[in-house]
From Swiss-Prot:
Phylogenetic classification of the source organism: Eukaryota, Viridiplantae, Chlorophyta, Ulvophyceae, OUU clade
NCBIfam families per the UniProt record, alphabetical: rplP_bact
Subunit relationships: Part of the 50S ribosomal subunit.
Pfam families given in the database record: Ribosomal_L16
Protein's name in the database: Large ribosomal subunit protein uL16c
Sequence similarity: Belongs to the universal ribosomal protein uL16 family.
Region called Disordered, residue ranges: 1-21
Subcellular location, record wording: Plastid, Chloroplast
Keywords: Chloroplast, Plastid, Ribonucleoprotein, Ribosomal protein
GO biological process: mitochondrial translation
InterPro entries: Ribosomal_uL16, Ribosomal_uL16_bact-type, Ribosomal_uL16_CS, Ribosomal_uL16_dom, Ribosomal_uL16_sf
Amino acid sequence: MLSPKRTKFRRHHRGRMKGKANRGNSIVYGDFGLQALEPGWIKSRQIESGRRVLTRYVRRNGKLWVCLFPDKPVTMRAAESRMGSGKGMPEYWVAVVKPGKILYELTGLTETVARKALRITGHKMPVKTQIVINKKF
């Protein structure tokens, strides 16, 4: 699973997800991409499961880029613990995603295979997604 090697602070605020993605909202590397349509948190396990699906389809003749990284810790307290006595320990890591953010990029595949792979990956994501194709392709 993806997680930062070290962070400046151990625990984060939850924050707000308002607005659209103004960076990372267009295909840069590949020919096909998976784009988020709604805001949400994507866990590192979900990113990894999507990457595995795409790697299976890409094999040796294509290339895959994962365009998001889980850099926000989500804390949880122990079950049945009393209120107070501080914030819980970091349980897992999430990537904050805004509408328009490109999640994965692919190249070196036919359009039908790429669409099939990205559709399966989109179903594994906790946010609605759409498949986008690079204009120069």
